[in-house]
């Protein structure tokens, strides 16, 4: 047997040769790593000395040549180059030679890995984690920062009960289930920490009953985007809040004016302005007087011009001012909207159009009356007044414009929209009850001469009022049978209305708490952003100094945990701890290559 020390091109290495077979060797790789079996993070079987190595030692002990002395110093590992880093796999799993890759790929797939979650250890296979390579546990580079070489495991200081659901996500191939003893916000934080992705988060929210938030598109043009934010989102800026305040004041003034103009004293003044009294006509001169023949000075009472009188009405002036603002706001929002089709289909925009439409019809009708012969026929005037009353009634819908600036009205609208099925059931149950009890009370009161129910349709009103527990008292049963029917009608109405009400209340609570949670999260994000900016200004200089002194600070610098970033602080000790972890990793690899049980021998 012959033993010799053979120098290598890329670094010194010791090779034992005996009996024509190559013995154990320790070769320094170009990257400064030892070419050894993949062991980091794996729960492998205990190592046994290879037969070749045992034979070599036995031959050396039986009188062969003594082993050459160990080198005094091991060559220092150099930093990996950019080309090596591109093809580098999981450093915690060692390296695999190209000719051994096909044979070892299957074994690596079934290798076991230990994961320590705040002291609770989980054991799984690499193939299970590799199903989702974009996640924290599935990506070898991402999970390396949490590897502990001394314990040969990955350590995460996270919530332990939540990891049952996280590990089940890998084992089940993508099914995410929240443990019953973990709250929603905690499990959502764990999903974000382990980087399971937006798709997993959306599925989790849908399974938990969350309604998907609709994305709000913005115009592409910068000017249109700014205008759209000012008029559509009052919370976006200070100018948007000012515009919202002006809009709310105009809406309130319009509604107050709509109500005050119906008071008797104001209505009488408006009638005087619209139709002032005609002064008495002088008597006609006698026939033949002043040498003139008989003539008629006037054919009837004259009507004063209406246009100046109408424009002098203060209610008309206030209404015109409000409509000018509403029209300006509608046109600006239509100009800046991201989609004209979506804008036209929006129910709130339809309400805005309906709110200003009656004014122009009323103004056109009054201007038409000023034309000669415009108001000659009384029948046409009566028809015009009836149409104007109906059109003016539409102005009351302006109150719904407040929902654009009120979160409470928006929550109420979303609640009614989500409870349409329950409201439909309520109306259907009331319809059945009205038919049954109106028919019953009619036949129960049919023989009584003083009955208030002349027909079944006439009893519909009584049934509706009784089932809704209002009871005006204008129609009431008199006989004993009619009173029994009325009692049953009232009881049935209470039960019918009470059944769908809890569902509607539950929907209201859901939307209310969701809105308050969004406001709290927005405030929290704003505070965190301020703290992050302040901490970045305070610790920027210190971080540069520490990185210049620590040799491995460049590696440990970008590996700050998301928790520390979320808190807005980055302890300086983390650079030193990660540098020490990398040194321990290389020391462990050298000790394993030399088959020595003590790392201090290095």
From Swiss-Prot:
Name of the gene encoding the protein in the UniProt record: Kcna5
Membrane topology: Multi-pass membrane protein
A GO biological process held by the record: regulation of atrial cardiac muscle cell membrane repolarization
MF (Gene Ontology): alpha-actinin binding; delayed rectifier potassium channel activity; outward rectifier potassium channel activity; potassium channel inhibitor activity; protein kinase binding; scaffold protein binding; signaling receptor binding; voltage-gated potassium channel activity
Compartment(s) of residence: Cell membrane
Bridged cysteine pairs (disulfide): none
Protein name stated in the entry: Potassium voltage-gated channel subfamily A member 5
Stretches assigned to the Extracellular side: 261-314, 369-384, 443-456, 477-483
Membrane-spanning ranges: 239-260, 315-336, 348-368, 385-405, 421-442, 484-512
